[in-house]
Curated annotation (Swiss-Prot):
Designated name of the protein: Probable chorismate pyruvate-lyase
Binding site for substrate: 77, 115, 174
Record-level GO cellular component terms: cytosol
PANTHER family reported in the protein's UniProt record: CHORISMATE PYRUVATE-LYASE
Keyword RNA-binding in record: no
Family the entry assigns: Belongs to the UbiC family.
EC number: 4.1.3.40
GO molecular function: chorismate lyase activity
InterPro entries: Chorismate--pyruvate_lyase, Chorismate_lyase_/UTRA_dom_sf
Chief location of this protein within or outside the cell: cytoplasm
Function: Removes the pyruvyl group from chorismate, with concomitant aromatization of the ring, to provide 4-hydroxybenzoate (4HB) for the ubiquinone pathway.
Top-rank taxon: Bacteria
This protein's UniProt keywords: Cytoplasm, Lyase, Pyruvate, Ubiquinone biosynthesis
């Protein structure tokens, strides 16, 4: 798997919309995956023998325009979630500096551990609303998929989930790559 044609950060400025008001959502089963209230990590692990997190990059960055309420630097982590060595999801997480020092969470020491395991195993992180986005076949996400040898014939979809910890908020964006969408349709994975 090579992603050398692009470099960290891979993310792009995205127009997110509220899932509750979303029109023209994709058909099932992708729609159910986008709106699933629980841990995407757990859902993905149920679809494979080997689940793996491949880190594309992480570090302090200024958020993209419109990506975070404050334009202060945040910790950005970008990974691929792979099922049986095939990338299914590109994930981009934004963590405010104030949360990096939280005792309950060792964000900087996650390594290849899935972030979802940490967030859904602690009551101090409360899952919030889900927003949805679609990506054209010319988007940076599509370019990333193509660099992973995944053909992009149709628009791609992703979701952004808010997580609250005390007065702080972090965002986890999960974009479904073509291999995931094809497998969901083929296996009828809801």
């Amino acid at each position: 798997m090579s992603v050398t044609s692009l470099s960290f950060p891979y993310g792009e400025s995205i127009q997110w919309f509220c899932a509750d008001n979303a029109k023209n959502l994709p058909s099932s089963p992708l729609k159910e995956w986008l709106l699933a209230p629980g841990s995407l990590t757990q859902k993905l692990k149920g679809c494979c023998d080997k689940f793996e997190v491949k880190i594309l990059g992480e570090g302090q960055c200024v958020p993209l325009e419109g990506e975070y309420p404050k334009q202060n630097a945040v910790w950005v982590r970008e990974v691929l979630l792979c099922l049986d060595s095939v990338p299914w999801v590109f994930a981009r997480t934004l963590i405010p500096q104030s949360l990096l020092s939280t005792r309950q969470a060792d964000f900087l020491g996650l390594g290849t551990r899935p972030l979802g395991e940490l967030l859904f195993s602690q009551d101090s992180f409360v899952p919030g609303r889900i927003e949805i986005a679609r990506f054209t076949t010319e988007s940076r996400l599509a370019q990333l998929a193509q660099s992973l040898a995944q053909n992009v014939e149709h628009e791609l979809w992703g979701r952004r989930r808010y997580f609250h910890h005390d007065q702080e908020e972090m965002f986890v964006s999960e974009m479904f790559l073509p291999a995931a969408v094809q497998a969901m349709a083929k296996l009828k994975l809801d």
